[in-house]
């Protein structure tokens, strides 16, 4: 008869209960590993500036929406502009925090296998994040401002 412990779905990672990681059908699946491996934080072959640019574009794009719909100017005609200004202010704060982290963490110049683990690499990542996030915020603002045109294109009004 099969041992009931062999049929558990949640078990210690690699059979070692002291690693502090639970192996579940979700966290250990090939789909999850592939998905996480393709995120810009873990993708191989990206330079720090491109990694920061891609992460920044995503963050800048999704930061505008909450400010437009939930911010103090949500019921006014300038809600989109208020969302853009607030989003860029938050991007500036995040960029300052990333820069401060890099200054504190990478004081010694040591050769690292990952270029992101050096002061120069982290500085490039921070610059890429700022440019990407600002660009993403402006793209979101433009789409919100021209929503009628974009909606017309998507519904086939302009053929």
From Swiss-Prot:
Compartment(s) where it occurs, according to its Swiss-Prot or TrEMBL record: Cellular thylakoid membrane
UniProt keyword terms in alphabetical order: Membrane, Photosynthesis, Photosystem I, Thylakoid, Transmembrane, Transmembrane helix
Superkingdom assignment: Bacteria
Membrane topology: Multi-pass membrane protein
Transmembrane segments: 53-73, 84-104, 125-145
InterPro entries hit by this protein: PSI_PsaL, PSI_PsaL_sf, PSI_suXI
Gene Ontology biological-process annotations: photosynthesis
GO cellular component: photosystem I reaction center; plasma membrane-derived thylakoid membrane
Protein name from the UniProt record: Photosystem I reaction center subunit XI
Native source organism of the sequence: Cyanothece sp. (strain PCC 7425 / ATCC 29141)
């Amino acid at each position: 008869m099969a041992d009931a412990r062999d049929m558990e779905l949640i078990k210690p990672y690699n059979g070692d209960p002291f690693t502090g990681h639970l192996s579940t059908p979700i966290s250990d699946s090939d789909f999850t590993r592939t998905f996480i491996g393709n995120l810009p934080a873990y993708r191989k072959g990206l330079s720090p500036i491109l990694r920061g640019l891609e992460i920044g574009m995503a963050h800048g794009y999704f930061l505008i929406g909450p400010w437009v719909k939930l911010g103090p100017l949500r019921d006014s005609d300038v809600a989109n502009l208020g969302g853009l200004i607030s989003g860029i202010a938050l991007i500036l704060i995040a960029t300052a925090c990333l820069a401060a982290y890099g200054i504190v963490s990478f004081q010694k110049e040591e050769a690292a296998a990952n270029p992101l683990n050096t002061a120069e690499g982290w500085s490039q990542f921070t610059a890429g994040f700022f440019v990407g996030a600002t660009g993403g915020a402006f793209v979101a603002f433009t789409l919100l401002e021209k929503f009628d045109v974009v909606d017309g294109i998507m519904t086939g009004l302009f053929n």
